[in-house]
Amino acid sequence: MKKKVIGLCMALFLLIFLFTPASQAATRFIRMFSGPEGGSWYPLGAAMMQIVENNIKGVSTSNGPGGGVGNCKAIQRGQADLGWTYTHTSFNAFNGKGKFDKKCDKLRHLMSLYPGVFQMAVPRDSDIHSVADLHDKRIVPGKVGFTGTAIAELVLKAYGITFDSIKKEGGTVNFVGYADAAALMKDGHIDCYMAVTSCPQATIIDLNFRPGVRFLGVDEEHMKKIHEMEPGLMPTVIPKTAYKGMTEDVPTVGTVTEIVASADLPDDLAYEIVKTLYAHWDDLKKVKKKAIEDSDPQKALLGVRIPVHPGAMRYYKEKGIKMD
């Protein structure tokens, strides 16, 4: 009897030993870094990863908060497989320019999404009417590692302003996320909230309710200076239909939201991810309708300035989607 029990235990042990590693090996873990809560990236990233996990056999996923600059660096370090960024940011990352002191040469384009619009909101009743007026004010350009923070720094530079010069003149620069920025403006602790996001943005809609906001524009002279410093940024507008109370379009700069992948992501898996996401495009509209409606699958290669992942390119060739 004792020998029979020992034999059964050994058989069970062998079954566990033989089959558990095989099942674990069959699971491929995909890590995505998207954006902060309060924006479009985080909820859409979470929805995308859930779609991938539910529809691609043997794949497990996660979606974490991040920023356009930091996400590129995370992929280069092998900490992420997929990341949200902007086309001009990925170009700088790939080439080691701007905020990147080293080349992120593992970056590959997966898909272009909707336009990212740089928005500078100030309280409606403030005496701030130009970017130049921010030289001694209290601002929130975003968190360190956010693409919006880098663009804010660039726009201010075109007007002869730096984060350091603001502080020297008695102003403050608060590197906080969307939710904290909204709280600071509602409490009267900041004068300008900056972000590059879809338009309209939930945080600004909230701020437009209280205290009420208006937007600072970028004039043609300074638009040219910005383009000289960063050719990847393009002139665009905050349309007058974006937020209640607007009476005219506001000129600003913009870019294209992009999902990038690691060159180490297997081609077949990249193909399946792109194919699966586009097959469930209507499901993503339930999360952020306006953002996804502005993300035309036929423009999946819009603004691309880095190599396209071979797996993604295979899908685009099948669908007849060509480079912009």
Kindly give the residue locations of the regions a language model identified.
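C-terminal segment of classical bacterial N-terminal signal peptides
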Residues: 15-24
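Bilobed "Venus flytrap"/periplasmic-binding protein-like clamshell domains
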Residues: 29-61, 116-187, 302, 306-311
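An extracytoplasmic/periplasmic, membrane-proximal ligand-sensing/linker region
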Residues: 180, 186-187, 192, 197-215, ...
